[in-house]
């Protein structure tokens, strides 16, 4: 009985701190126990790595005690890297674009731990890159050969120069614009960075004989309802088409192109959890866009471990999707975070609903309607079976899209994106009007000239 436990722990025994130290408990019971503990007035902490602690004779107990984190109540299991994953980067020259970001920086941490020959961090944001550089220098010192390059993936000449200089064996392409509402307002920037940036890095990877190129994608690329998701879907399509062209001998090269696709990560820059923490510190309210909005979550370290695992098993031309577990209602997440702070939702801290933002879905999908998956040796990783695209057509289409984006015409840019990604249907966005017209990508010989001219005029008037 939760009330009985709360009374016993909080008052009768005059307990001030509860230390959770049950390493074998399953996720459901862990959440239940922590939920009961958090309803008391006690300070709740977790003793981690208890088995290792016992093996070390009980030394350094305090260093293994930490506060309860939101991932503890979401029930995400820890994933350990295999020896095969270590061989992917051990003794290799590894480049990470977007290496200062949430995913990119964690990839750098895990790669550094595997002993690469050299690690190259590429990022346009010098503060983020500098922070990761200093962290890795403190941890590894001269044992890690580390280079930080301030560069934009949009700059094809600079990208080519970096590849020529470092000759990387493995490339993780994590550089991207990711904020949905901002990209609705600046679709040309999403195209330049997410689409053309991927084009630049992938072409250089092929040109300089990179062994493996790994694209970090998102579940928002599936049946996209916003510009950001559509731009990432185009990046997926380009990488996949290039890989197919290589396998068919249409393009010279040996690079294995692999895509990894997953949902939200806990605590990434600008995401919901840091925002909730900031709102809690200010006394609330916690803002949620819709009472029924749900998202899949995994921790950043877990996502990066799965990226590395998928990179090992990939042979080229795969899109790997990850087991994201059970979806979480954002409203429930808000309540859990309030409770973790020792407060009562609706009493101490309010939750308010602000309405869906432009391009925002109530739920995300990891697979499109006509996609299905195949199992892999890792039970948390699946291979998506997706449609194939002709490389020459896609390369020409991206070149045209880049030219349109350069005009800074938002509507024209999004119109072309919808032509290339027909499943892209805008939601809560000014671009919804574009979906009212059928966009015919090729000339229909049975269509009269006057009818075709009328159709084009209607589209151009939007």
Residue ranges and their predicted role:
Residues 150-170:
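Conserved Rossmann-fold cofactor-binding substructure of NAD(P)-dependent oxidoreductases
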Residues 94-114:
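N-terminal Rossmann NAD(P)H-binding glycine-rich loop of SDR-like oxidoreductase domains
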């Amino acid at each position: 009985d939760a009330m009985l436990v709360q009374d016993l722990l909080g008052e009768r025994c005059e307990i001030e701190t509860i230390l959770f130290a049950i390493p074998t408990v399953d996720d459901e019971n862990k959440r239940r126990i922590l939920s009961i503990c958090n309803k008391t007035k006690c300070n709740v902490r977790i003793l981690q790595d208890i088995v290792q602690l016992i093996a070390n004779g009980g030394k350094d107990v305090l260093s293994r005690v930490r506060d309860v984190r939101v991932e503890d109540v979401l029930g995400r299991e820890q994933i350990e890297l295999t020896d095969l994953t270590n061989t992917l980067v051990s003794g290799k020259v590894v480049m990470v674009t977007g290496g200062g970001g949430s995913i990119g920086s964690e990839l750098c941490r895990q790669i550094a731990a595997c002993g690469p020959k050299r690690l190259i961090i590429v990022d346009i944001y010098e503060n983020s890159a500098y922070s990761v550089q200093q962290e890795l220098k403190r941890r590894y010192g001269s044992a890690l050969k580390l280079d930080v390059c301030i560069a934009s993936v949009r700059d094809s000449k600079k990208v080519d120069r970096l590849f020529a200089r470092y000759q990387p064996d493995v490339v993780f392409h994590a550089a991207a614009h990711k904020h949905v509402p901002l990209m609705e307002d600046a679709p040309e920037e999403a195209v330049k960075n997410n689409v053309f940036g991927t084009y630049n890095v992938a072409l250089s990877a092929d040109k300089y004989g990179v062994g493996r190129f790994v694209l970090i994608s998102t579940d928002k690329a599936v049946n996209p309802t916003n510009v950001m998701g559509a731009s990432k879907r185009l990046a997926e399509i380009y990488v996949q088409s290039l890989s197919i062209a290589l396998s068919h001998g249409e393009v010279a090269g040996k690079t294995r192109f692999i895509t990894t696709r997953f949902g939200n990560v806990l605590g990434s820059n600008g995401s919901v959890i840091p925002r909730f923490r900031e709102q809690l510190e200010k006394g609330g309210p916690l803002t949620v866009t819709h009472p029924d909005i749900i998202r899949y979550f995994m921790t950043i370290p877990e996502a990066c471990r799965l990226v590395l695992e998928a990179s090992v098993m990939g042979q080229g031309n795969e899109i790997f999707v990850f087991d994201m577990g059970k979806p979480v209602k954002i409203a429930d997440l808000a309540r859990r975070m309030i409770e973790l702070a020792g407060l009562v939702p609706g009493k101490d801290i309010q939750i308010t609903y602000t309405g869906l933002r432009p391009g925002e879905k109530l739920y995300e999908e990891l697979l499109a309607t006509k996609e299905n998956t195949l199992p892999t040796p890792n039970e948390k990783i699946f291979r998506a079976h997706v449609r194939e695209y002709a490389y020459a057509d896609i390369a020409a289409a991206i070149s045209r899209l880049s030219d349109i984006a350069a005009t800074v015409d938002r509507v024209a840019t999004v119109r072309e994106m919808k032509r290339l990604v027909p499943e892209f249907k805008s939601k809560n966005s000014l671009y919804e009007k574009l979906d009212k017209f059928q966009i015919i990508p090729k000339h229909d010989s049975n269509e009269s000239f006057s009818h075709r001219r009328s159709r084009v005029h209607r589209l151009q008037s939007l």
